């Protein structure tokens, strides 16, 4: 109800305001249209066709040895539980958070994006559909805080003081970061992607962990770009 009642603070396409509300709403739309839980639909329609064997919502205990802890509860490490409180209230399955995946699976997904909807088994999504998601949807602007966005993806420029995509990724690049310390950036012009999975959120006593991770992300992206050139 709160999401339905929310009103835009700027016209579409005029300003970038990071928000989870649209993704939460999209997940609910999928649930209502299909009559099935979002995780069931995502597994059948996305994860299995892409061959993503270690991508899932609400991982069971058997997955815990493969999941880095991202928090502490009464002094004990906690892993395999979504950190986002809104997703937690939705049972751990939501359109904006709650998904766990391995580096190998994310790399396979990145290859799928680079090939514009195709993998070794054939084409799964139309090229024009993929391009609709990865093409910048906001006006190009420069300067501090001027972030660009595609549909569900961050685009360039990121508007950050230190870009998580570094300084060398091409203008058509797209990616996303995660609060717990994860990130994926894809450069179609270089046929390059960078996956960086950390558990930054597990360091409650570390100072400036978010700022430092931004710098690390940028440095890793630049190193990968130089290596590919």
Show the residue positions of the predicted features:
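A short acidic/small-residue loop/turn micro-motif
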Residues: 200-203
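Surface-exposed amphipathic alpha-helical segments
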Residues: 209-229
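Short acidic, glycine/proline-rich loop/turn micro-motifs
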Residues: 14, 206-207
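Juxtamembrane/interface motifs at transmembrane-helix termini
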Residues: 60-63, 206, 213-216
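Short, surface-exposed beta-strand/loop micro-motifs that present aromatic residues
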Residues: 98, 173-174, 180-193
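Short, surface-exposed loop or secondary-structure junction motifs
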Residues: 1-172
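Short, polar N-cap/turn motifs at the start of nucleic acid-interacting alpha helices
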Residues: 195, 205
């Amino acid at each position: 109800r709160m999401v339905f009642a929310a009103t835009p603070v700027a016209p579409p396409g005029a300003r970038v305001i990071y928000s989870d509300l649209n993704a939460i709403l999209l997940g609910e739309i999928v649930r209502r249209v299909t009559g099935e839980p979002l995780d069931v639909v995502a597994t059948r329609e996305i994860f299995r066709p892409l061959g993503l064997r270690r991508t899932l919502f609400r991982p069971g205990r058997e997955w815990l040895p493969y999941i880095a802890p991202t928090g502490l509860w009464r002094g004990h490490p906690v892993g395999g539980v979504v950190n986002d409180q809104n997703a937690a209230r939705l049972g751990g399955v939501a359109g904006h958070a709650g998904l766990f995946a391995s580096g190998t699976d994310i790399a396979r997904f990145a290859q799928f994006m680079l090939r514009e909807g195709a993998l070794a088994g054939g084409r799964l999504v139309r090229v024009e559909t993929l391009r609709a998601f990865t093409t910048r949807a906001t006006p190009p602007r420069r300067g501090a805080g001027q972030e660009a966005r595609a549909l569900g993806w961050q685009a360039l420029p990121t508007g950050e003081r230190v870009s998580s995509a570094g300084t060398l990724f091409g203008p058509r690049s797209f990616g996303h970061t995660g609060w717990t310390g994860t990130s994926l950036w894809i450069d179609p012009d270089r046929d390059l992607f960078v996956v960086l999975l950390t558990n930054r959120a597990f360091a409650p006593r570390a100072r400036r962990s978010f700022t430092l991770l931004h710098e690390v992300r940028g440095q890793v992206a630049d190193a990968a770009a130089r290596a590919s050139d």
